[in-house]
Regions:
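Mobile "lid/hinge" segments at catalytic clefts and subdomain interfaces of large enzymes
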Residues: 1-81
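Accessory "access/gating" subregions that flank catalytic or transport cores
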Residues: 52-169
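Active-site rim segments in enzyme catalytic domains, especially the processed small/beta chain
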Residues: 173-176
Length: 176
């Protein structure tokens, strides 16, 4: 800091605790990962869309009637996105049963979007929460808290990574 002529700030109260608290780093890294994931996810959506169209896949797999038979997380919303794009395309499909990598697009991508949505919720909760411990309550009591620990954020990040890996594997299978 000195070599760059940056004046050191005066620290007060719990400033040092804030600087060494892992929550700030977790929030920042999660925000970056979330931004990258949203970009990559949309690319994976379009990649599947173009692959499906080039393959002349059976578009019935995206119909509302089919996707309401068994509701997986995000499946209906994802299928509806593809259905709305394909509904006016009248090409006859190559076959009744396409390879699994095509038939499972709405299930896998739907779960991916569900996990991303949940990640956003957990990240916003952490961003807007107080992770201090101890804290001073309104009645001026000093109490210990568990708020510094957020395993939900770590677990949903892991779920997003697993969903992305599953979607990437499907994409890989479609190009073989």
């Amino acid at each position: 800091l000195v070599s760059n002529k940056i004046k050191l700030p005066k620290l007060e109260g719990k400033d040092a605790m804030v600087l060494i608290n892992h929550s700030c780093l977790s929030i920042a890294l999660t925000g970056k990962a979330l931004s990258d994931t949203l970009n990559v996810f949309m690319m994976m959506q379009f990649s599947a869309l173009f692959s499906f169209e080039a393959f002349i896949g059976n578009k019935q797999i995206f119909s509302p009637e089919v996707n309401e038979l068994r509701v997986s997380p995000g499946q209906n919303e994802c299928a509806r996105w593809y259905y709305n794009i394909f509904k006016n395309i009248l090409k006859k499909p190559r076959r009744l049963q396409d390879p699994l990598s095509f038939r499972t697009i709405s299930v896998c991508h739907g779960l991916g979007m569900t996990n991303i949505t949940r990640l956003i919720e957990y990240w916003e909760n952490e961003l807007n929460g107080i992770s201090d411990s101890p804290v001073v309550l309104n009645n001026k009591d000093l109490v210990s808290t568990p708020n510094f620990h957020n395993p939900a954020l770590a677990q949903i990040m892991e779920s997003v990574a697993l969903s992305n890996a599953m979607i990437a594997n499907g994409s890989f299978q479609r190009i073989q």
